[in-house]
UniProtKB/Swiss-Prot annotation:
Keywords: Endonuclease, Hydrolase, Nuclease, RNA-binding, tRNA processing. GO terms for biological process: tRNA 5'-leader removal. The keyword Transmembrane does not apply. RNaseP catalyzes the removal of the 5'-leader sequence from pre-tRNA to produce the mature 5'-terminus. It can also cleave other RNA substrates such as 4.5S RNA. The protein component plays an auxiliary but essential role in vivo by binding to the 5'-leader sequence and broadening the substrate specificity of the ribozyme. It comes from Bacillus cereus (strain 03BB102). One of its GO terms (cellular component) is ribonuclease P complex. NCBIfam families: rnpA. Its EC number is 3.1.26.5. GO terms for molecular function: 3'-tRNA processing endoribonuclease activity; ribonuclease P activity; tRNA binding. It comes from the Bacteria. Belongs to the RnpA family. The gene is rnpA. InterPro entries: Ribosomal_Su5_D2-typ_SF, Ribsml_uS5_D2-typ_fold_subgr, RNase_P, RNase_P_CS. This is Ribonuclease P protein component.
Length: 115
């Protein structure tokens, strides 16, 4: 993912948390905030220390980033997303992570995701 597609600063995370809408399934919580003036989407990732050690947390983040990269043409532009991973992610394969992300994005009202 390119740097312009990432949310890194704490105040940007807090804005999405406070003003955005949330949707969830057992594996992920996704907050989304509409930003009409922004021509692209941005993603912020959060994986708690409760999930596992650094190796496990980084593996989960890599799988989420790869899933987003594959789905980037179907994700609505002009939005900020914060994805929070929950404990069941630690034992999931890449295919399961991608399928779960598609499910939670569909629940959040994205019409373009078809997979």
């Amino acid at each position: 993912m390119k740097k312009k597609h990432r949310i890194k600063k704490n105040d940007e995370f807090q804005t999405v948390f406070q003003k955005g809408k949330s949707n969830a399934n057992r594996q992920f919580v996704v907050y989304q905030l509409d930003k009409a003036e922004q021509p692209y989407f941005r993603i912020g990732l959060s994986v708690s220390k409760k999930i596992g050690n650094a190796v496990v947390r980084n593996r989960i983040k890599r799988m989420i980033r790869q899933s987003i990269t594959e789905l980037k043409d179907e994700i609505d532009s002009g939005k900020d997303f914060v994805i929070i991973a929950r404990k069941p992610c630690a034992e999931m394969t890449y295919e399961e992570v991608k399928k779960s992300l598609i499910h939670v994005f569909k629940r959040s009202g994205m019409k373009r995701i078809k997979k």
